[in-house]
Amino acid sequence: MFEVPLLLVIIVLAALIFDFTNGAHDCANAIATVVSTKVLTPRVAVGMAAALNLIGALLGTKVAMTLGGGIARPDVVVGSHILVLAALVGAISWNSITWYFGIPSSSSHALIGGLMGAALAHAGVDAINGGSILGKVVLPLILSPLGGFFMGILAMMLINFAFFKLARPIANRFFKKAQVLSAGLMALSHGMNDAQKTMGVITLALLIFGEIEVFAVPLWVKLTCALAMAMGTAVGGWKIVRTMGHKIFKLEPVHGFAAETSAAMVIGCASLMGAPVSTTHTITACIFGVGATKRLSAVRWGIAGNLLIAWVLTIPASALVGGISFYILEFVTGLH
């Protein structure tokens, strides 16, 4: 039989492990294009991404509020000490599988799926916050890649119009410098959205265990989540960088600038609205959009099929693992 305080420590550690895998998996999105175009070395890019993720993570808590209370109803799950741990097991499992195979699926989808599966296992459909999950979670997750695709097209068209008289080598020299700024904006927006998701999960656990009385993200939660994500970026992001930066479309600095700027705008706006979106979906869609403006054959559309399968499977797969994990933990710990 587990003591409740020990279980809370385990949950917080599991959440930070998820954040670490998120850094290894999703934070590569912030630096994939700037590394693949050789504007920055991997070491410099990782350092920049880590610093700006830390800053971004401290800029708000709206996304954390949505993740903590917009998926599972706090009034229903408040008595379940194992729910958050089961959700994290589902998310971490799927993240690990897709990371191993170098597939840029969505950690956001994995976390949402894990929470949904564990909540359903605990109390059925009554545990799901139906009204909030549609408007603040499902629609943004669907619309953000569509917005990213068309923003990528629009950004590239505007750049082509503004610089059409400039020779490509000269333009690329300019955008090599500009891409440092766009990569920084992408890293900042990533911290604003993705780091807050784990903050929301940990804060929900603190609320369930009675460590806090109202849903408010403590400063130590913000800092530890930001640091865990930065460490994950440094350790494991390069498999995803290769897929994002080379396999989809052969990127030049101008393309990297357009894709990063477009993605940063979409993700930043979503963060200000408190919408947890997929940074993976968004930057990938931006790269597809940018590539499509050159010529359709320049984009390796075959990659899209593999990515689409992973994206479609992520929520149900992580929900299934989250639900099974809940029942296993319930049996092992004797808790609910």
Each predicted region: which residue ranges?
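Multi-pass alpha-helical transmembrane bundle typical of ion/small-solute transporters
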Residues: 1-336
